[in-house]
Amino acid sequence: MHFHRVPLVAAIGSISLVLFLVACGGPFPQSALHPTSDFGYALDDLFRTIFWLALGVFVVVESLLVYVIVRYRARPGQPPPPRVHGNTLLEAAWTLAPAVILMFVAVPTIQTVFRTDGSAPEGALEIDVIGHQWWWEYRYPEYGIVTANELHVPRGRPVVLKLTSADVIHSFWAPRIGGKRDAIQRRQNRLAFTADSVGVFMGQCAEFCGESHARMGLRVLVQDSSDFAAWVAAQTAPPVPEDSLTELERRGLEEFREIRDPASNSCIACHAVQGISAGVLGPNLTHVASRGTIAAGMLPNDSANLARWLRDPKAIKPGSKMPAIGLSTDEIEALVAYLRRLR
Protein backbone atom coordinates (compact mmCIF):
# COMPACT_ATOMS: atom_id res chain seq x y z
CA MET A 1 0.00 0.00 0.00
CA HIS A 2 1.27 3.48 -0.83
CA PHE A 3 1.72 5.46 2.38
CA HIS A 4 0.08 8.57 0.97
CA ARG A 5 -3.17 6.60 0.81
CA VAL A 6 -3.17 5.73 4.53
CA PRO A 7 -5.05 8.91 5.65
CA LEU A 8 -7.75 8.26 3.04
CA VAL A 9 -8.18 4.66 4.15
CA ALA A 10 -8.25 5.74 7.80
CA ALA A 11 -10.90 8.37 7.05
CA ILE A 12 -13.08 5.89 5.17
CA GLY A 13 -12.66 3.37 7.98
CA SER A 14 -13.59 5.93 10.64
CA ILE A 15 -16.70 7.05 8.75
CA SER A 16 -17.74 3.43 8.23
CA LEU A 17 -17.30 2.71 11.95
CA VAL A 18 -19.40 5.74 12.91
CA LEU A 19 -22.18 4.72 10.50
CA PHE A 20 -22.06 1.18 11.86
CA LEU A 21 -22.39 2.39 15.45
CA VAL A 22 -25.22 4.77 14.53
CA ALA A 23 -27.11 1.82 13.04
CA CYS A 24 -26.97 0.16 16.46
CA GLY A 25 -29.16 2.87 17.98
CA GLY A 26 -32.81 2.30 18.88
CA PRO A 27 -35.60 2.00 19.46
CA PHE A 28 -36.23 -1.44 18.00
CA PRO A 29 -39.71 -2.53 19.15
CA GLN A 30 -39.32 -5.96 17.56
CA SER A 31 -35.79 -6.72 18.69
CA ALA A 32 -35.17 -10.21 20.04
CA LEU A 33 -32.10 -8.92 21.92
CA HIS A 34 -34.19 -7.55 24.81
CA PRO A 35 -36.31 -10.52 25.99
CA THR A 36 -39.11 -10.15 28.53
CA SER A 37 -40.14 -13.76 29.17
CA ASP A 38 -38.63 -17.10 30.13
CA PHE A 39 -38.95 -18.23 26.51
CA GLY A 40 -37.11 -15.12 25.34
CA TYR A 41 -34.37 -15.57 27.94
CA ALA A 42 -33.82 -19.18 26.82
CA LEU A 43 -33.33 -18.05 23.22
CA ASP A 44 -31.11 -15.18 24.31
CA ASP A 45 -28.89 -17.55 26.33
CA LEU A 46 -28.54 -19.83 23.31
CA PHE A 47 -27.78 -16.91 21.00
CA ARG A 48 -25.06 -15.55 23.28
CA THR A 49 -23.50 -18.98 23.80
CA ILE A 50 -23.25 -19.61 20.06
CA PHE A 51 -22.14 -16.03 19.39
CA TRP A 52 -19.14 -16.28 21.72
CA LEU A 53 -18.28 -19.72 20.40
CA ALA A 54 -18.44 -18.45 16.82
CA LEU A 55 -16.37 -15.40 17.75
CA GLY A 56 -13.69 -17.65 19.22
CA VAL A 57 -13.61 -19.78 16.07
CA PHE A 58 -13.42 -16.63 13.94
CA VAL A 59 -10.48 -15.23 15.94
CA VAL A 60 -8.53 -18.50 15.77
CA VAL A 61 -9.12 -19.05 12.05
CA GLU A 62 -8.42 -15.46 11.04
CA SER A 63 -5.30 -15.32 13.24
CA LEU A 64 -3.94 -18.43 11.55
CA LEU A 65 -4.81 -16.97 8.16
CA VAL A 66 -3.02 -13.68 8.90
CA TYR A 67 -0.01 -15.56 10.28
CA VAL A 68 0.28 -17.71 7.15
CA ILE A 69 -0.11 -14.69 4.86
CA VAL A 70 2.63 -12.77 6.67
CA ARG A 71 4.94 -15.68 7.40
CA TYR A 72 4.90 -17.12 3.90
CA ARG A 73 4.47 -13.97 1.83
CA ALA A 74 6.46 -13.65 -1.38
CA ARG A 75 9.85 -11.97 -1.06
CA PRO A 76 12.13 -10.55 -3.77
CA GLY A 77 14.43 -13.20 -5.20
CA GLN A 78 12.75 -16.03 -3.35
CA PRO A 79 12.19 -19.19 -5.42
CA PRO A 80 8.64 -20.58 -5.78
CA PRO A 81 7.68 -22.82 -2.84
CA PRO A 82 7.46 -26.57 -3.41
CA ARG A 83 4.04 -27.98 -4.26
CA VAL A 84 2.32 -29.89 -1.48
CA HIS A 85 -0.21 -32.58 -2.43
CA GLY A 86 -1.84 -33.18 0.93
CA ASN A 87 -1.21 -33.62 4.62
CA THR A 88 -3.15 -36.39 6.31
CA LEU A 89 -2.78 -34.93 9.79
CA LEU A 90 -4.02 -31.48 8.78
CA GLU A 91 -6.90 -32.91 6.75
CA ALA A 92 -8.01 -35.03 9.70
CA ALA A 93 -7.72 -32.03 12.03
CA TRP A 94 -9.86 -29.68 9.94
CA THR A 95 -12.45 -32.42 9.52
CA LEU A 96 -12.67 -33.29 13.22
CA ALA A 97 -12.48 -29.71 14.52
CA PRO A 98 -15.80 -28.60 12.91
CA ALA A 99 -17.45 -31.80 14.18
CA VAL A 100 -16.34 -30.99 17.73
CA ILE A 101 -17.52 -27.39 17.36
CA LEU A 102 -20.93 -28.58 16.12
CA MET A 103 -21.22 -30.80 19.18
CA PHE A 104 -20.77 -27.72 21.39
CA VAL A 105 -23.51 -26.01 19.34
CA ALA A 106 -25.86 -29.01 19.30
CA VAL A 107 -25.99 -29.64 23.05
CA PRO A 108 -27.30 -26.21 24.17
CA THR A 109 -29.53 -26.04 21.08
CA ILE A 110 -31.25 -29.33 21.94
CA GLN A 111 -31.57 -28.26 25.57
CA THR A 112 -33.26 -25.04 24.45
CA VAL A 113 -35.63 -26.94 22.15
CA PHE A 114 -36.87 -28.95 25.13
CA ARG A 115 -37.05 -25.86 27.37
CA THR A 116 -39.35 -24.16 24.84
CA ASP A 117 -41.44 -27.14 23.70
CA GLY A 118 -44.78 -25.52 24.58
CA SER A 119 -45.40 -27.31 27.87
CA ALA A 120 -46.55 -25.28 30.86
CA PRO A 121 -47.44 -25.95 34.49
CA GLU A 122 -50.96 -26.59 35.72
CA GLY A 123 -52.95 -23.39 36.08
CA ALA A 124 -51.48 -21.73 33.00
CA LEU A 125 -53.70 -19.36 31.06
CA GLU A 126 -54.68 -21.09 27.82
CA ILE A 127 -55.43 -18.93 24.78
CA ASP A 128 -56.54 -20.18 21.38
CA VAL A 129 -54.78 -18.21 18.63
CA ILE A 130 -56.22 -18.43 15.11
CA GLY A 131 -54.42 -16.87 12.16
CA HIS A 132 -56.55 -15.34 9.40
CA GLN A 133 -55.66 -13.45 6.24
CA TRP A 134 -54.60 -10.91 7.60
CA TRP A 135 -55.43 -10.64 11.29
CA TRP A 136 -55.21 -12.61 14.53
CA GLU A 137 -58.10 -13.99 16.55
CA TYR A 138 -57.71 -14.72 20.27
CA ARG A 139 -60.07 -16.87 22.31
CA TYR A 140 -59.86 -17.14 26.10
CA PRO A 141 -61.88 -20.27 27.03
CA GLU A 142 -61.36 -19.62 30.76
CA TYR A 143 -63.22 -16.30 30.50
CA GLY A 144 -65.37 -16.72 27.39
CA ILE A 145 -63.61 -13.82 25.67
CA VAL A 146 -63.11 -13.53 21.90
CA THR A 147 -61.03 -10.62 20.62
CA ALA A 148 -58.57 -9.75 17.86
CA ASN A 149 -55.00 -8.59 17.23
CA GLU A 150 -54.22 -7.41 20.77
CA LEU A 151 -53.20 -10.26 23.07
CA HIS A 152 -53.65 -9.43 26.77
CA VAL A 153 -51.74 -11.57 29.30
CA PRO A 154 -50.98 -11.18 33.01
CA ARG A 155 -47.42 -10.69 34.18
CA GLY A 156 -45.98 -13.61 36.10
CA ARG A 157 -48.62 -16.18 35.11
CA PRO A 158 -47.67 -18.95 32.68
CA VAL A 159 -49.44 -18.63 29.34
CA VAL A 160 -49.97 -21.28 26.67
CA LEU A 161 -50.91 -20.22 23.15
CA LYS A 162 -52.62 -22.93 21.11
CA LEU A 163 -52.02 -21.92 17.52
CA THR A 164 -53.91 -22.89 14.39
CA SER A 165 -55.01 -21.24 11.14
CA ALA A 166 -58.31 -20.62 9.40
CA ASP A 167 -56.72 -20.57 5.94
CA VAL A 168 -53.04 -20.59 4.95
CA ILE A 169 -49.92 -21.05 7.09
CA HIS A 170 -49.14 -18.13 9.38
CA SER A 171 -46.44 -17.75 12.04
CA PHE A 172 -46.95 -15.99 15.37
CA TRP A 173 -43.86 -14.01 16.37
CA ALA A 174 -43.47 -11.44 19.12
CA PRO A 175 -39.65 -11.27 19.30
CA ARG A 176 -39.33 -9.92 22.84
CA ILE A 177 -41.70 -12.60 24.12
CA GLY A 178 -40.03 -15.54 22.40
CA GLY A 179 -39.52 -17.50 19.22
CA LYS A 180 -42.04 -17.89 16.46
CA ARG A 181 -44.51 -20.73 16.05
CA ASP A 182 -46.35 -21.68 12.88
CA ALA A 183 -50.15 -21.58 12.79
CA ILE A 184 -51.30 -24.34 10.44
CA GLN A 185 -54.82 -25.27 9.39
CA ARG A 186 -56.21 -28.44 11.06
CA ARG A 187 -53.16 -28.65 13.32
CA GLN A 188 -52.34 -27.20 16.73
CA ASN A 189 -48.92 -25.92 17.78
CA ARG A 190 -48.18 -24.64 21.26
CA LEU A 191 -46.14 -21.70 22.51
CA ALA A 192 -45.65 -21.30 26.26
CA PHE A 193 -44.12 -18.36 28.13
CA THR A 194 -44.23 -16.39 31.35
CA ALA A 195 -43.79 -12.65 30.85
CA ASP A 196 -41.99 -10.69 33.57
CA SER A 197 -42.27 -7.10 32.33
CA VAL A 198 -45.36 -4.94 31.94
CA GLY A 199 -45.63 -3.25 28.55
CA VAL A 200 -46.74 -3.45 24.95
CA PHE A 201 -44.62 -5.74 22.80
CA MET A 202 -44.91 -5.70 19.02
CA GLY A 203 -45.12 -8.75 16.83
CA GLN A 204 -45.72 -9.84 13.28
CA CYS A 205 -46.78 -12.78 11.16
CA ALA A 206 -43.44 -14.32 10.17
CA GLU A 207 -44.61 -16.67 7.41
CA PHE A 208 -45.47 -15.26 3.99
CA CYS A 209 -49.24 -15.63 3.79
CA GLY A 210 -50.38 -13.55 0.84
CA GLU A 211 -50.86 -10.04 -0.42
CA SER A 212 -51.00 -8.24 2.94
CA HIS A 213 -48.59 -10.46 4.87
CA ALA A 214 -46.48 -7.44 5.86
CA ARG A 215 -49.63 -5.78 7.26
CA MET A 216 -50.46 -8.63 9.65
CA GLY A 217 -49.11 -7.17 12.85
CA LEU A 218 -49.96 -7.99 16.46
CA ARG A 219 -49.45 -6.55 19.92
CA VAL A 220 -48.89 -8.40 23.18
CA LEU A 221 -50.04 -6.36 26.17
CA VAL A 222 -48.51 -7.66 29.42
CA GLN A 223 -50.43 -6.30 32.42
CA ASP A 224 -50.27 -6.46 36.19
CA SER A 225 -52.81 -8.85 37.68
CA SER A 226 -55.15 -6.02 38.70
CA ASP A 227 -55.09 -4.41 35.26
CA PHE A 228 -55.58 -7.77 33.58
CA ALA A 229 -58.54 -8.52 35.87
CA ALA A 230 -60.05 -5.13 34.96
CA TRP A 231 -59.58 -5.91 31.26
CA VAL A 232 -61.28 -9.30 31.70
CA ALA A 233 -64.20 -7.65 33.51
CA ALA A 234 -64.61 -5.11 30.71
CA GLN A 235 -64.42 -7.76 27.98
CA THR A 236 -66.97 -10.03 29.67
CA ALA A 237 -69.45 -7.20 30.24
CA PRO A 238 -72.40 -7.06 27.82
CA PRO A 239 -72.24 -4.46 25.04
CA VAL A 240 -73.84 -1.08 25.51
CA PRO A 241 -77.66 -1.46 25.78
CA GLU A 242 -79.69 -0.10 22.90
CA ASP A 243 -81.76 2.22 25.07
CA SER A 244 -78.63 4.14 26.06
CA LEU A 245 -77.56 4.86 22.48
CA THR A 246 -77.82 8.33 21.00
CA GLU A 247 -79.88 8.83 17.87
CA LEU A 248 -76.76 8.75 15.68
CA GLU A 249 -75.46 5.61 17.41
CA ARG A 250 -78.87 3.94 17.03
CA ARG A 251 -78.77 4.63 13.30
CA GLY A 252 -75.31 3.05 13.26
CA LEU A 253 -76.70 -0.06 14.94
CA GLU A 254 -79.40 -0.28 12.30
CA GLU A 255 -76.76 0.04 9.57
CA PHE A 256 -74.82 -2.75 11.26
CA ARG A 257 -77.91 -5.00 11.36
CA GLU A 258 -79.09 -4.25 7.83
CA ILE A 259 -79.19 -7.15 5.38
CA ARG A 260 -77.69 -5.82 2.18
CA ASP A 261 -77.67 -7.09 -1.37
CA PRO A 262 -75.64 -9.22 -1.74
CA ALA A 263 -75.90 -10.57 1.80
CA SER A 264 -72.11 -10.89 2.00
CA ASN A 265 -71.97 -7.08 2.12
CA SER A 266 -73.84 -7.08 5.44
CA CYS A 267 -71.83 -6.32 8.58
CA ILE A 268 -73.57 -9.09 10.53
CA ALA A 269 -72.58 -11.66 7.88
CA CYS A 270 -68.96 -11.56 9.02
CA HIS A 271 -68.74 -9.82 12.40
CA ALA A 272 -70.02 -10.76 15.84
CA VAL A 273 -71.40 -8.41 18.47
CA GLN A 274 -72.71 -10.16 21.55
CA GLY A 275 -76.51 -10.33 21.51
CA ILE A 276 -76.75 -8.87 18.00
CA SER A 277 -74.85 -11.00 15.49
CA ALA A 278 -72.73 -14.13 15.37
CA GLY A 279 -70.49 -13.71 12.32
CA VAL A 280 -67.18 -15.56 12.44
CA LEU A 281 -65.37 -14.56 9.24
CA GLY A 282 -64.15 -11.22 10.57
CA PRO A 283 -62.95 -9.94 13.95
CA ASN A 284 -65.35 -9.98 16.89
CA LEU A 285 -66.51 -6.39 17.46
CA THR A 286 -68.25 -6.71 20.83
CA HIS A 287 -65.66 -4.45 22.47
CA VAL A 288 -63.82 -3.15 19.40
CA ALA A 289 -63.52 0.39 20.78
CA SER A 290 -61.38 -0.90 23.66
CA ARG A 291 -58.58 -1.86 21.27
CA GLY A 292 -55.75 0.53 20.59
CA THR A 293 -55.52 -0.20 16.88
CA ILE A 294 -57.54 -1.50 13.95
CA ALA A 295 -56.58 -3.36 10.74
CA ALA A 296 -54.17 -5.67 12.61
CA GLY A 297 -52.18 -2.85 14.15
CA MET A 298 -51.95 -0.68 11.04
CA LEU A 299 -54.02 2.28 12.26
CA PRO A 300 -54.74 3.89 15.63
CA ASN A 301 -58.31 3.14 16.65
CA ASP A 302 -60.02 6.50 16.30
CA SER A 303 -63.05 7.84 14.47
CA ALA A 304 -61.13 9.14 11.46
CA ASN A 305 -59.36 5.84 10.83
CA LEU A 306 -62.53 3.81 11.35
CA ALA A 307 -64.18 5.96 8.70
CA ARG A 308 -61.23 5.41 6.33
CA TRP A 309 -61.44 1.67 6.87
CA LEU A 310 -65.21 1.49 6.33
CA ARG A 311 -64.94 3.58 3.18
CA ASP A 312 -62.38 1.38 1.40
CA PRO A 313 -60.65 -1.42 3.34
CA LYS A 314 -58.60 -2.61 0.36
CA ALA A 315 -57.01 0.82 -0.04
CA ILE A 316 -55.47 0.29 3.41
CA LYS A 317 -54.93 -3.47 3.31
CA PRO A 318 -54.76 -4.88 -0.26
CA GLY A 319 -56.51 -8.22 -0.59
CA SER A 320 -58.66 -7.67 2.49
CA LYS A 321 -61.75 -9.87 2.46
CA MET A 322 -63.86 -6.97 3.71
CA PRO A 323 -65.48 -5.36 0.65
CA ALA A 324 -66.01 -1.68 0.00
CA ILE A 325 -69.83 -1.64 -0.09
CA GLY A 326 -70.35 1.96 -1.14
CA LEU A 327 -71.46 3.39 2.20
CA SER A 328 -72.54 7.01 2.13
CA THR A 329 -70.88 9.62 4.33
CA ASP A 330 -73.91 9.65 6.64
CA GLU A 331 -73.90 5.85 6.92
CA ILE A 332 -70.21 5.81 7.74
CA GLU A 333 -70.67 8.54 10.36
CA ALA A 334 -73.45 6.55 12.04
CA LEU A 335 -71.50 3.27 11.96
CA VAL A 336 -68.41 4.94 13.40
CA ALA A 337 -70.48 6.47 16.21
CA TYR A 338 -71.93 3.04 17.07
CA LEU A 339 -68.63 1.17 16.88
CA ARG A 340 -66.95 3.77 19.10
CA ARG A 341 -69.51 2.94 21.83
CA LEU A 342 -68.55 -0.74 21.82
CA ARG A 343 -66.11 -0.60 24.70
Segments and roles (model prediction):
Residues M1-G26:
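N-terminal secretory/membrane targeting signals
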Residues G25-T49, I69-S266, V273-V280, G297-R311, ...:
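Non-transmembrane, membrane-proximal soluble domains of secreted or membrane proteins
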Residues L342-R343:
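Short, solvent-exposed mixed-charge patches
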